[in-house]
Regions:
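Terminal amphipathic alpha-helical/low-complexity segments used for targeting or macromolecular assembly
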Residues: 1-12, 117
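Structural signal for interior beta-strand "rungs" in well-ordered beta-sheet cores
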Residues: 10-112
Length: 117
């Protein structure tokens, strides 16, 4: 097993490039390894899972409103807004705004249903 661990080291990095004054309370990371967050603003009680990228498209950054969930492996890029209570499914690539209370999946991300949590 030792050689396996040497060849396949787990990436344990969590990089946050959002100023603390632009992050509301309650932000949580579930297994935040290999995760990059460079949002313009992060609302209250957002949840971000592992291997997520939230970042620039060269000039603009995403906005996450309140109670947004970004699932494992998702990418949110550029001048987009994830409105309150939306969910981004695992592996989705978000390049457009996501409406309030909406679940999106796929590449590019498309709405599949309302979030009724």
């Amino acid at each position: 097993f030792r050689s396996f661990r040497i060849l396949f080291k787990q990436m344990e990095s969590l990089y946050i490039n959002t100023p603390p004054e632009r992050i509301e309370g309650g932000l949580s990371f579930q297994h935040g390894f290999s995760t990059v967050v460079a949002a313009k603003h992060i609302g209250q009680d957002c949840r971000i899972f592992q291997q997520v990228t939230i970042g620039f498209n060269g000039t603009e950054q995403p906005v996450l409103e309140d109670r947004v969930e970004v699932s494992a492996g998702a990418i949110v890029i550029g001048n987009v807004c994830l409105h309150s209570d939306c969910v981004v499914g695992a592996g989705a690539v978000v390049v457009n705004d996501v409406n309030e209370n909406t679940v999106v999946v796929g590449v590019p991300a498309k709405p599949i249903r309302l979030n009724r949590e």
